[in-house]
């Protein structure tokens, strides 16, 4: 089973433009992320996929592998699918470009789902963590997920799901963590299927998979990634080196 990591890397960012090219201890954020993914030794190959010549050249000139994205894309899945459609690969792991301090364990967790899936019932694997604070549960930036008894996703939402009409029934609220592993075919199917109303309403690409009947296996984790979304995040990351 050939497993690769793909790091989608857009140059533009609404909250922090050009964040991936910011200096982080003598290396750019995107280069640190790329090298950290390689150093996990989990992947047969690692690629950065980008719409930016600056980012592309940054990786290539530092002996890395990068692919220029040809089209404009609505989502990370679309960008990855375009890049890998002609690659010989079985499983594709999406690594966030703005998380230079990669934790190996959660990546191992999503990969292991496919090693155990001998009957190929899983199309995607992703992570979730329990949240208990009311503000975290109600925050629309924290995407919530509900799963069935076997851990397959039933729905993702920015709203509070399930709604607490009765509060004392032992409901655990789960936040979706945006680390994905895909079967190649699931990505290619996604790429060629139009967006439907649920994805358009919530602005959550994972809903396209559910709307078209794909099965997403969710694994509970305690992992919380350290992402760089603001200048303050960057300063915090610099202090960790």
From Swiss-Prot:
Q: What is its main location?
A: cytoplasm
Pathway linked to the protein: Nucleotide-sugar biosynthesis; CMP-3-deoxy-D-manno-octulosonate biosynthesis; CMP-3-deoxy-D-manno-octulosonate from 3-deoxy-D-manno-octulosonate and CTP: step 1/1; Bacterial outer membrane biogenesis; lipopolysaccharide biosynthesis
* Example GO biological process: CMP-keto-3-deoxy-D-manno-octulosonic acid biosynthetic process
Keywords, sorted A to Z:
Cytoplasm, Lipopolysaccharide biosynthesis, Nucleotidyltransferase, Transferase
An example GO CC term for this entry is:
cytosol
Answer whether the UniProt record assigns the keyword Repeat to this protein.
no
The UniProt record lists the EC number as: 2.7.7.38
What role is this protein assigned?
A: Activates KDO (a required 8-carbon sugar) for incorporation into bacterial lipopolysaccharide in Gram-negative bacteria.
Entry similarity comment: Belongs to the KdsB family.
What PANTHER family does the record point to? 3-DEOXY-MANNO-OCTULOSONATE CYTIDYLYLTRANSFERASE, 3-DEOXY-MANNO-OCTULOSONATE CYTIDYLYLTRANSFERASE, MITOCHONDRIAL
Name of the protein in question:
3-deoxy-manno-octulosonate cytidylyltransferase
Designated gene of the protein: kdsB
């Amino acid at each position: 089973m050939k497993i690769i990591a793909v790091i989608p890397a857009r140059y533009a960012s609404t909250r922090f433009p050009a964040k991936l090219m910011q200096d982080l201890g003598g290396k750019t954020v995107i280069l640190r992320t790329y090298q950290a993914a390689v150093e996990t030794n989990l992947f047969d190959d690692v690629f950065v996929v980008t719409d930016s010549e600056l980012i592309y050249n940054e990786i290539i000139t530092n002996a890395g592998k990068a692919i220029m994205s040809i089209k404009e894309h609505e989502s990370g899945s679309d960008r990855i699918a375009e890049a890998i459609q002609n690659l010989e690969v079985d499983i594709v792991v999406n690594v966030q470009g703005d998380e230079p301090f990669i934790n190996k364990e959660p990546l191992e967790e999503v990969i292991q789902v496919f090693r155990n899936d001998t009957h190929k019932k899983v199309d995607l694997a992703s992570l979730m963590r329990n949240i208990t604070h009311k503000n975290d549960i109600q925050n629309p930036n924290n995407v919530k997920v509900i799963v069935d008894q076997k851990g397959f996703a039933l729905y993702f939402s920015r709203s509070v799901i399930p709604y607490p009409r009765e509060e004392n029934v032992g409901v655990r609220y789960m936040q979706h963590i945006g680390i994905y592993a895909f079967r190649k075919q699931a990505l290619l199917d996604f790429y060629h299927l139009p967006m439907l109303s649920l994805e358009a309403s919530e602005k959550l690409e994972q809903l396209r998979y559910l709307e078209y009947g794909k099965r997403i296996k969710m694994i509970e984790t305690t992992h919380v990634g350290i992402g760089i979304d603001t200048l303050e995040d960057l300063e915090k990351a610099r202090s960790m080196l």
